[in-house]
Amino acid sequence: MDNGMPRARPGIDAYPLEFSGGGGEFFRVWIVNVLLTVVTFGFYTPFARRRTAQYFWGHTMVADSPLEFTAQQKKMVVGFLLLVVLYLAFKVAAETGQDTTVSLMMLAGAGFAPYFWGSAMRFRLNATRWRGVRLQFTATWPEVYFASWPLFIAALAWAGAAVAIDARVSPSMTPAQAKAAAGPVLIAVGFALLVTVVCLMRLEFNYKSLLVGKARIGGQPGRWKPVFGDFVKIWLATVGVFVGSVVLVAVLLVAVTGGLGSLLPRKAGLAAILIGIALFIAFVFLLFLVSGPARAYREARLHRLVWNNIGVSHVARFKCDLRVGGYVMLRVKNILLTLLTLGFYRPFALVSEYRMKVDSVTLHVKGGLDQLAGQLAREEQGLGDAIADAAGLDLVG
């Protein structure tokens, strides 16, 4: 009976995500993986990937319950061996001058790239469980290939550039003809590069939106809100950060070389060689650093954008408060320490960056967590395994 009182709206509970792993603990997993991969000439790679995924999944706490990585090792090994065979076949064809075979294999690789991506996402999500409920990727192959159209546009751009270059360049060209052809060749390459960058932006947006929109947990679909313009803004801002980093490095190089340049004429023999080697190492070191802040900036901005604009149907959503500046500084510190320790700081770097991203996300659930978990478990039982196995062959782990 309605007594005129408003109905109580279901409450929304917040559950911060948490990563409970540690750098020292993961270092033991990492060093064993590295040693066994070296000893087995790389064939331990699928086992190493599974151990790494199990560690990070198992220490990622969502509402006080860890994720589970349940991928079958056999599938990961078969996929890895198949990729090794394909790579060796391509390398043999390239080194023996089989240009037609190489071209056909490259075209086949471009054609199968969406299939590999779709198989990888299906494999990864199907291997992830939370409270016994499995995630699923339900996109059809036509949907995957339609989302991959930027990949084919980029391939056509480079094919057109190759045709244009072939028409302008020949082995019998005179120096004057080569000079005249340089302009059109640069224009063709520049146009292909520009098209590729735009296509990469669109491809990233298409794949992320398809992954979230076609993901299922217990039958509940994912919810995706970002638009392509959001990705364009992040890419443009990333270019600005990269240019700023280049300018800063250039100023440092001028200052260092200007100070040491006066020493070179007065030094002879071994001392001059050592100074030259030191400058070269510093140059390579700075080149490696120059892209680090830009890549970290883009990664952090995308992390915030995605996790602030996705959810699970209308029953759960996420919020992210990742500090972009803090993440960039963490990446720079990790790069420096990894270089100074000859790579041995790498596992600590991975853990610290993963923890910062995970700990920045909060899950908001409508109606209570136990009610949601029970609903997801019941709906999953009705779906069965048909959707999960629709790919037929999961190649990439």
Predicted regions and their residues:
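Transmembrane-helix bundle segments that line or gate the permeation/cavity pathway
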Residues: 1-26, 30-167, 195-208
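Charged, low-complexity, helix-prone segments enriched in Lys/Glu/Asp/Gln
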Residues: 48, 52-53, 118, 199-207, ...
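Juxtamembrane inter-helical linkers in multi-pass membrane proteins
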Residues: 57-66, 123-141, 208-231, 300-325, ...
